[in-house]
A protein has these predicted regions:
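A charged, well-structured terminal subsegment
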Residues: 144-148, 152-167
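Short, acidic/small-residue loops that bind anionic groups at enzyme active sites
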Residues: 111-121
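Conserved non-catalytic scaffold segment of RNase H-like nuclease domains
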Residues: 1-112, 126-130, 134-152
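Short acidic/histidine-centered micro-motifs embedded in hydrophobic/aromatic stretches
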Residues: 117, 139, 181
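Acidic two-metal-ion nuclease catalytic site recognized across multiple nuclease folds
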Residues: 1-3, 162-200
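Active-site catalytic microenvironments for nucleophilic, acid-base chemistry
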Residues: 105, 123, 139, 164-171
């Protein structure tokens, strides 16, 4: 895989307040440049949700209402996040969730495409059986020594997802092959289905 052929790509992870639909509490966006996660130009935002953080959500990511009380409201940072994401490709683990939540919070935003490391892992490791982020970290053993934060925080999970993407991408020869394996049907960037040549 020649990483120089990749378009602009941000690995994203979001954490919510636990309601349905969720209010965002944390967003991370980590660029991949030359086959490496670039923490020096990453975007990271904490935001105070409109509704309280549920106890379950706090048990997952560790963020409480007290932690977020002095953080800006989403309306104050949405423009910055929108500008940062731009029209780059994004990647996430179980990307339907992150894409759907971000799209709901960023009207008018549309990435060039969406890579899903969950879908990619199923294509790359069909024998694995389970494809949670923890299971893939255990199986692939990516270098997480420079991962910021802790598991289930957006910055850590984005970094881990980036390292998993890079490791799995090395098994594909071209960007187009990676896209075919990693973009879920119906999401931006999905390859067009081949037309039946007998139809006109």
């Amino acid at each position: 895989m020649n990483f120089a052929t990749w378009p602009a790509l941000l690995v994203v992870d979001v954490e919510g307040n636990g309601t349905n639909p969720p209010d965002l509490v944390e967003v991370a966006a980590l660029p991949i440049r030359d086959g490496r996660p670039d923490k020096s130009t990453a975007g990271w935002w904490l935001t105070c949700p409109n509704r309280p953080v549920t106890p379950f959500a706090t048990r997952v990511h560790g963020l409480t209402d007290t932690d977020l009380a002095d953080k800006p409201a989403w309306t104050e940072i949405a423009g910055k996040v929108h500008t940062f994401l731009g029209d780059a490709w994004i990647c996430a683990h179980n990307a339907h969730t992150d894409y759907r939540v971000l799209a709901a919070h960023l009207p008018g935003w549309e990435p060039a495409g969406v890579l899903d490391t969950l879908r990619l892992a199923k294509a790359t490791f069909p024998e694995l059986g389970k494809y949670s982020l923890d299971k893939l970290i255990e199986h692939v053993r990516p270098d997480l020594s420079e991962a910021p934060g802790a598991r289930h925080r957006a910055t850590f999970d984005a970094y881990a997802t980036a390292q998993l993407l890079i490791a799995m991408a090395s098994r594909y020869d071209t960007w187009d092959q990676l896209v075919a394996a990693a973009v879920p049907p119906g999401l931006p960037g999905a390859p067009e289905p081949e037309k039946d040549p007998t139809l006109w």
